[in-house]
Amino acid sequence: MKTNEPLPLSSASAARRFRITALLLAALWTAVPTLVFPNFRLDIVEQFFVGQEWTFGSGSHPALTANLLDLVSRFAGIAAAPSLTAALFNLLALWSIWRLAREYLDADLALAAVFAMFGYWYLFQMEGTRYNNSVTLDAFWIFAAFLALKAIETEKNIWWLAAGAGIGLGLYFKYTEAVLALVIVLFLAADRDKRHVWRTAGPWISTATALLLFTPYIVWLLKSEFFASLAYAAGNAPRREGWQGHLLAPLEFLSNQLPLVLPPLLCLIPILWRGKGKRPDETPLPERPETGAWKRRYLNWLLFGPLLFNLAWSALGGVFLRCDLGCHIWMPLSVWALAVFGTKTTPRAAARSRAISLIFDFVCLLGVAVLVPLAPLFEKNLPRYHFPGKEVAALAESVWHEEYSRPLPWVMGEPWTRGALYDAWPWLAGNVSLYGRDRARVYSGPSHSSWGSIDQVRREGGLFLWTAGERDGEFLDALRRDFPALRVVGAYTVRPKSRFAKKDVPVGIALIPPESDEKKNSAP
């Protein structure tokens, strides 16, 4: 009996479709944000001014993510660099998911697993355009996890070397990569079929490679005594004392993960819903690749090990973890779901799942193109990506150059949290550094800026910017303790370019004269 059931995809055809689709989405998710975002969000502005320092670390993370953005911006320009760099890391992540999927699934299901991750918030989605340490971590997390799988399977030293390199480099993006190393070590210690690898050179080659690659960072950390990023990683989350915190914190973390896991799982419904059987006129998919029991256990460890780590951290410490601290956990989600539940499906179901994934991604892309320009119309406060950064930078540099002919060396500002001075990165100052011709360096206090000091800013001079009219005296009084010669220049208003902006942006500017000027003024 003839049917309209499509034939299963060959491995070559599935690989070709993956490459074409991934490259197309990378191009679109680079072009559309570049064209519609008039400015960047805080994370990206931070990456720019940290990246231009070419340091090992900042007050929140290792700086390789920022350094790579600075490198790409030199070739692609400031406007396109964040989306382009994020797209490159997303491609690495998707390639790793594809290769991981082919270890467990036939070509049709492996392609469906990758396509489902097009709906993942930290890949080709809105958050994927927000180039930051989470985006780079996600890519190297799943990349190193795949390399480790091949190392464990083949027991070849070249794969162990590659896995160690993946973890060692991943630590330069976010310390969280160490959790992956811990999960792999625990798996190898617990799994009865793979425990014997400890008697081979492989795991020790991997460990030595990771440590060797990360040693320069450790040496820098010890020499500079700049441990702020370690403190940030350990304590950057609110805590609640008592049993309520220990109970509610992990539950809140789990609930916050639902927006991350639901889109990929919904895209897989045609496969998962039909997993219990097929119609008589449907052609089943061919047998999936031979998968040993240890491989399935490795996939379980890869998904649930990091999740249990975060839940234990949250429960034991009463720590309310942010949603993005779980973004790396779900990178193998679609592969796991299909490996466990996607049995007895058909090419038609796999094709429908892929179609849903593509439609979802293109709808989200269209939403970015339409809603971002209209955002000031609906939001009470001006979104940061509509902030008139170029205009503020031009204003600040004109104030400096009225006094001095040399480039503006330093710029400081109120923290984006609106907290105390030096509490967090300065939003206004970051825009001046990013868009100004002088590319001034940003100083945000000893716990954030490893590349400067109060003495250096005092010696070379600079500007301080804040939201005029809000806590003027508080900031200026705190500043004068470090910079006695501080002089308020004035308050200005800057008009956002968006026609939907409801009000102007008030900007206060104060001048920090160079120390040489102070000496001249005090000379008899």
How should these model regions be labeled?
Residues 53, 147, 159-174, 209-212:
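Membrane-interface alpha helices of multi-pass inner-membrane proteins
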Residues 53-54, 297, 301, 317-353:
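Hydrophobic/aromatic-rich transmembrane helices and adjacent perimembrane loops
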Residues 84-105, 119, 124, 142-143, ...:
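Transmembrane-helix motifs of polytopic, lipid-linked glycan transferases
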Residues 102, 107, 144-160, 341:
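Membrane-interface transmembrane helices that cradle and orient dolichyl/undecaprenyl
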Residues 126-136:
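Short acidic/glycine- and proline-prone juxtamembrane loop motifs at membrane-interface regions
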Residues 181-295, 306, 311:
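Transmembrane-lumen/periplasm boundary regions of multi-pass, lipid-linked membrane glycan transferases
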Residues 319-323, 347-409, 413-419, 423-441, ...:
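Membrane-proximal, lumen/periplasm-facing interface regions of secretory-pathway glyco-
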